[in-house]
A protein has these predicted regions:
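N-terminal glycine-/serine-/threonine-rich beta1-alpha1-beta2 phosphate-ribose binding loop
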Residues: 2-142, 154-169
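Non-transmembrane alpha-helical segments in soluble domains
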Residues: 12, 59, 82-85, 109-112, ...
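C-terminal helical cap and adjacent loop that interface with cofactors, partners, or active-site loops
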Residues: 15-19, 23, 30, 243, ...
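NAD(P)-dependent dehydrogenases' Rossmann-like dinucleotide-binding region
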Residues: 49, 195-212, 225-227, 231-239, ...
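Short basic (Lys/Arg) and small-residue
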Residues: 147
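A contiguous active-site-proximal alpha/beta segment in oxidoreductase catalytic domains
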Residues: 150-228
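Oxidoreductase and adenylate-handling cofactor-binding alpha/beta cores
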Residues: 180-204, 216, 257-259, 266-292, ...
Length: 433
């Protein structure tokens, strides 16, 4: 069993062990840099976070990959940790591959320090995304990280820098880019091919921002490392709504609270702002201004202004609605419609935009680990997308507009830059990248 405490200087030393060459390589350079450290020529992967998303999605996806060996699981709840360990061991022991057993612990730092682990899949609550991601990159691991990528704008910037400076392949879990749940790639192809003409606005129908946590204290049962679950968040008593004990089939309510998440706005915004960014060809940039709704009680209606005048609005039907000179297009899970209908009914011609097809979100990540190319939902795409939602939340929480510089990841008014991050407990400060 891993030790419960690891001093921060040990964590920083471990996390920074290979961060000695801050060279940023382009995709063509990466393509010749493929590597396999595993003696059995498989990619040794550790799963960090064993909740519902990991149980329903990541675990089965990883176990079915022939070139992956899931060698470790990390989870603060002992019941879930044991369940995942048993699932992995049963899966591999029933096959013919050479398997030495999957280990389990609750401290991600001990996993990241292991030389035999090539990559990590992070499926923790939102406030526990950035630190393991950055540390994994600095320790030479490739990363798949659930969306929304971060809790703050500063974390988003550092995740990109950590990946680039350490030449890591980092996939954001915005799997709609791999056409999971609907024809999202096709919608983007229609828009980029000019089927709508010049785009004037986009509406994004997703949930509301989070609120301060006001849950009462509950008695905690043995088997949960509650202080580790809190991590950077302020110390507070346990409540089962935040981390239900054992295995469960629902999404816990930590997403509703500011201390741990940006709410439905970042949760589903990480999917649909992402599709809007993709369609607008803004994957390396973002809006320059956010304006809150006039109704001070409203949690929808924030407006995001791009430097070319395109306006994105939080609100409207579920998914994304694009409005252009020649009509409109609505893309949502299981739905792609347009007015006029011919916009999406007419097949793409050879001369129009055809984007690469992803073989699946995990498969794309694993293939890129070999090729050293950027995956379909590369870390910067995820970082730029979540920054939009963070800007919107700041506009809602403070009921004011902000001017933002996407190139510097900072506000035009330096007096606002303290809002790029938030206070965090001493043990969990952001490392130098």
């Amino acid at each position: 069993m891993p030790s419960k405490k690891m001093k921060r200087r040990t964590f920083v030393k471990t996390a920074a062990a290979v961060a000695l060459t801050p060279t940023i390589l382009n995709s063509s350079t990466w393509a010749g840099a493929g590597r396999r450290r595993s003696p059995n020529q498989r990619i040794n992967v550790a799963l960090i976070g064993c909740g519902k998303m990991a149980k329903d999605y990541h675990l089965p996806e990883l176990l079915k990959q022939p070139d992956v060996q899931l060698v470790s699981v990390c989870e603060v709840d002992k019941t879930r940790r044991d369940f995942f360990q048993n699932q992995v061991n049963q899966h591999y022991s029933s096959g013919k591959r050479n398997f030495n057993g999957c280990d389990a612990g609750f401290d991600f730092r001990e996993i990241i320090s292991r030389a035999d682990i090539d990559a990590v899949c992070i499926a923790t609550p939102d406030h526990w995304h950035a630190l393991p991601l950055i540390a994994a990159c600095q320790a030479g691991k490739d990363v798949y990280c659930e969306k929304p990528l971060t809790l703050t704008i500063r974390e988003a910037q550092l995740c990109v820098e950590a990946a680039r400076r350490n030449n890591r392949v980092v996939q954001t879990g915005s799997q709609q880019r791999s056409n999971v749940f609907g024809p999202f790639r096709e919608a983007v192809e229609f828009i980029r091919s000019g089927r709508l003409g010049k785009i004037s606005r986009v509406t994004i129908g997703v949930g509301a921002p989070s609120k301060p946590c006001d849950l009462p204290e509950e008695a905690i049962e043995p088997g949960l490392e509650w202080d580790m679950w809190l991590g950077q968040a302020p110390a507070r008593p346990f409540h089962s709504d935040l981390s239900p004990r054992g295995m469960h089939n629902h999404f816990p309510s930590w997403r509703s609270y500011q201390e741990f998440s940006g709410g439905g706005h970042t949760d589903m915004g990480a999917h649909f702002y992402d599709i809007a960014q993709w369609a607008l060809d803004r994957d390396q940039s973002g809006p320059i201004k956010v304006i809150p709704p006039e109704d001070v009680s409203s949690n929808t209606g924030a407006r995001f202004i791009y430097d070319d005048g395109v306006e994105m609005i939080h609100g409207g039907p579920s998914g994304c609605v694009f409005y252009g000179e020649k009509g409109k297009l609505h893309i949502d899970r299981g739905r792609l419609t347009s007015d006029p209908e011919e916009i999406v009914k007419t097949p793409l011609a050879d001369h129009e935009v055809h984007l690469p097809k992803s073989p699946g979100h995990h498969r794309n990540w694993l293939d890129c680990i070999e090729s050293r190319e950027h995956p379909v939902a590369d870390v910067e795409k995820g970082a730029r997308t979540v920054t939009i939602a963070h800007l919107g939340n700041l506009a809602y929480w403070h009921r004011r507009a902000f001017d933002f510089n996407p190139e510097t990841w900072s506000f035009k008014d330096p007096n606002d830059n303290h809002l790029l991050d938030r206070p965090r407990r001493a043990e969990w400060q952001l490392p130098e990248v």
